[in-house]
Amino acid sequence: MKKLFLTIFSFITVMLYSQKVDSNKIYTASYYAYNTTRYTASGQKFNNYGLTAAHKTLPFGTKVKVTNVNNGKSVVVTINDRGPFKKTPDFKYYSRVLDLAKGAFLKIASAGAGVIKIKYEILE
């Protein structure tokens, strides 16, 4: 019974962490920030200038490399929240997959950009 449990647990873990991302596909990302104290879906205190991001399904703690396709700048973020949930008709051919904390966004784009085209890669 113990072996069966470990086998199933290992299989599920591998499936969760082996989510495929098409590294050639272009997605969109934006940033979010708050003026008051908020907590992320993972229970961490949100830091406007942290290197964190929200994703709908990736496990909390996953490291993701995000690259701005317009300027080639990259940042590595940790998933600690859920989202994005905003619909983007202006980017109907792209899928918004990440909301970056403002600090992470500013590493790869100006705040005035608002929404940027990205590629991303799951690191761990």
Describe the residue ranges of each PLM region:
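Positively charged n-region of N-terminal signal peptides that target proteins for export
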Residues: 1-4
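Hydrophobic h-region of N-terminal signal peptides that target proteins for export
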Residues: 9-18
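Secreted/periplasmic proteins
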Residues: 17-124
